């Protein structure tokens, strides 16, 4: 049975819903998915897919089918001047493609090596961090870290299709559908003014389309041979989508492996981001996926801390303007700021939102960066409550911060450690 047939199975949708809501899932997404399932929103989309497969031109283009074109948008991150291009399908089609991706990643997970950590069932980036930490003599090894430049949108579709054909040989209908999506050259460009014919349709090379659900499966598949090559030779290596790190006992071995990565990517039509290429010595430690390894300890990477502090500063400035404009007290603004960041940093009981304490706490082994964030957060709240950045802000005492809702990351981390140790002890007693 083709995976496409499961897209019409209500029981399959319920399993998907139960899975998503069991994880760190935004509440808004859970509500939208529930409404979509209750309304059987997949039915029109499955009809579009059937029409696509029945259309004789589908193998070449989606031009005369009912499946919509993806929309293109160029977005910029607040923390940098860099822009990136993302693609999205309309909400109903996007939701169906999310289920299809979920099914794909599970059925074909056996294609991938154990050193790949992106978008895999039961595996997270934290598993990569933990495995690297357990690698024998990792603190004495030379490291190489690389980032693939614009990976998703740079994958040459003509090179991916033979790999996809081999992987999905037993499901020709699925292969036909996915090939049609990949080879469709047209997109809707929101930056192009509307013309009489609809006007936003442009033609371009778009790779595997960053932002679309299926790109996760393609990103894993396209470099699986490189992953396997390092795994078979026992070289410490990890890949999370476009982020790569590897280790060697000598600088010469490390450099040879780095050259191998560069050559492999070049053969696949890809290139490395030179600004993110790092050759490390044992005494340097290394950072990977938001974590920093140094002298046998794991902490939050400096770049992650910097990004959070920038967000805190922007929010504090915005709330300072807000309370002055509204004629409200500084304490009102301080309390509002704390509510925003408490939601980001701490998961509430029964809350499935992804938060810092769920992501970082189980992995880090020291609290230096948590302490740095605590001090910065206290300063932002004192500024809002006192209405000044002068020394007068220290008139706002620590007890005042706690009354407004402040929670210390360091304190919460130690409490979490105690809970983890107690739970582990209880489990050992039971066994």
Where are these regions (language model features)?
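Conserved phosphate/pyrophosphate-binding and hydrolysis machinery centered on Walker-type P-loop NTPases
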Residues: 89, 122, 212, 363-370
């Amino acid at each position: 049975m083709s995976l496409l047939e499961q897209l019409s199975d209500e029981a399959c949708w319920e399993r998907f819903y139960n899975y998503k809501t069991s994880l760190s899932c935004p509440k808004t997404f859970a509500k939208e998915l529930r409404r979509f399932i209750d309304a059987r929103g997949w039915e029109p989309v499955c009809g579009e897919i059937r029409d696509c497969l029945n259309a004789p031109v589908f193998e070449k283009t989606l031009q005369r089918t009912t499946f919509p074109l993806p929309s293109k948008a160029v977005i910029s991150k607040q923390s940098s001047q860099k822009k990136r291009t993302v693609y999205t399908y309309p909400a109903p089609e996007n939701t169906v493609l999310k289920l299809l991706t979920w099914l794909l990643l599970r059925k074909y997970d056996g294609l991938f090596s154990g050193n790949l950590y992106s978008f895999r069932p039961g595996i997270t980036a934290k598993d990569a961090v933990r495995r690297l930490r357990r690698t024998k003599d990792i603190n004495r090894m030379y490291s190489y870290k690389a980032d693939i430049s614009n990976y998703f949108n740079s994958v040459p579709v003509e090179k991916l299709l033979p790999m996809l054909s081999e992987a999905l040989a037993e499901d020709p209908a699925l292969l036909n559908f996915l090939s049609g999506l990949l080879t469709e050259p047209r997109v809707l460009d929101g930056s192009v003014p509307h013309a009489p014919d609809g006007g936003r349709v442009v033609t371009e090379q778009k790779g595997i389309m960053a932002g679309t659900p299926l790109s996760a499966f393609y990103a894993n598949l396209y470099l699986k041979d490189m992953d396997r090559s390092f795994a078979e030779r026992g070289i410490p290596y990890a890949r999370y989508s476009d982020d790569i790190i590897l280790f060697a006992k000598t600088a010469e071995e490390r450099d040879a492996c780095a050259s191998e990565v560069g050559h492999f990517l070049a053969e696949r039509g890809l290139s490395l981001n030179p600004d993110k290429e790092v050759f490390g010595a044992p005494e340097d430690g290394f950072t990977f996926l938001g974590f920093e390894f140094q002298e046998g300890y794991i902490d939050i990477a400096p770049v992650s801390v910097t990004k959070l502090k920038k967000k805190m500063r922007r929010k504090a400035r915005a709330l300072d303007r807000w309370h002055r404009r509204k004629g409200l007290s500084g304490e009102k603004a301080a309390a509002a700021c704390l509510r925003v960041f408490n939601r980001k940093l701490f998961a509430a009981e029964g809350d499935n939102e992804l938060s810092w304490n769920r992501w970082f706490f189980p992995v880090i082994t020291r609290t230096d960066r948590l302490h740095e964030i605590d001090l910065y957060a206290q300063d932002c709240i004192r500024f809002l409550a006192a209405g000044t950045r002068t020394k007068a802000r220290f008139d706002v005492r620590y007890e005042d911060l706690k009354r407004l809702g402040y929670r210390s990351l360091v304190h919460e981390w130690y409490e979490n450690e105690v809970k983890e140790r107690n739970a582990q002890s209880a489990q050992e007693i039971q066994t």
